[in-house]
Amino acid sequence: KVAAKYDISENLGVRASFNTGFRAPTPGQQGTTNVSTRLPQGFPVAVGLFPASSPVAKALGSSDLLPETSEGISVGLVGNLGDLDFTIDYYSIDVDDLFAAISTRSVSTDPTNTDAYANFLALDAAGVVGANTIGGVFYFQNGYDVNSSGVDAVLTYPFESDYGLSVLSLTYGFNEREFESDASGYLNAEGIYDVQNFEPNTRAILTLNHSFDDFALMIRTSYWGESSNYQSGNIQDFDPVSMTDIQLTYFGELFDLTFGGMNVFDEYPDEDEIGDYCCGRIYPSISTISWQGANWYISATKEF
């Protein structure tokens, strides 16, 4: 990694970096075997995750896992306007041979189901025990090359009054992910679409920390931008979501007492409308946005 910073003035600087890296496959990616019953479209199917080096995966054309490699650049501004501190950075990261679980390869003993039947014949020819009981197979591969690029910004503003010290901060991130190589040999149309569209491109967090005498208050609002999901030929667009957390702490002589709430306004992401759910959930199965509603907590801590 090489990084440099140049101060244009007392209040403004430019910084940049270039780095390379690699990531070896984890023991889990290399060695996990896990066969479970899943419910795509509401019907039970035995689906198995197998090591890329296993006879099952080899029969369907897998290759042994190799390390990922990456190159990244960033350039940005850092400075202050009075009491307002800020950083704004652009970044671009290329990852070659990204580890990814391939889209599930269907397996069927029904000759009319052409691709799935061909997979069954391949497993049977490889001597896989119980091949006729498997409904789907997937495994990790060095699948494709991707580029992730975006902008991160952080603004911090402290202010003091007769009522204590407050610090207001805003973090903002915008990210796009694009394929740099053909991924169709590893992902189906749904997988390719979701890599680029399922995660919100925009994320922001506004936080107020306030301290006064023996009390500390934190109010944080998190924002996720628009996203969309592909399932069985259908596309669903999801609206932006905002959730607010509040926490109040009293620092006592005997112990500290904290009371707080997460998602205090009980907000939820859009419900799934195209069948991408599992196990009784009504929200997309791989959603990274909390779907459990508001929850509250109280805790007491004491240092010895």
What does each model-found stretch correspond to?
Residues 10-68, 92-130, 228, 262-283:
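Surface-exposed extracellular loop regions of Gram-negative outer-membrane beta-barrel proteins
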Residues 91-232, 299-303:
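Gram-negative outer-membrane beta-barrel transporters
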Residues 7-11, 70, 81-84, 148, ...:
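Outer-membrane beta-barrel channels and translocator barrels
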Residues 2-4, 14-20, 29, 79, ...:
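Transmembrane beta-barrel strands of outer-membrane/channel proteins
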Residues 176, 223-229, 249-304:
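C-terminal beta-signal and adjacent terminal beta-strands/loops
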Residues 24-89, 93, 136-151, 156-161, ...:
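Outer-membrane beta-barrel signature, preferentially recognizing the C-terminal barrel domain
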Residues 1-3, 17, 64, 74-78, ...:
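Outer-membrane beta-barrel architecture
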Residues 1-3, 13, 72-74, 201-205, ...:
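Transmembrane beta-barrel architecture of outer membranes
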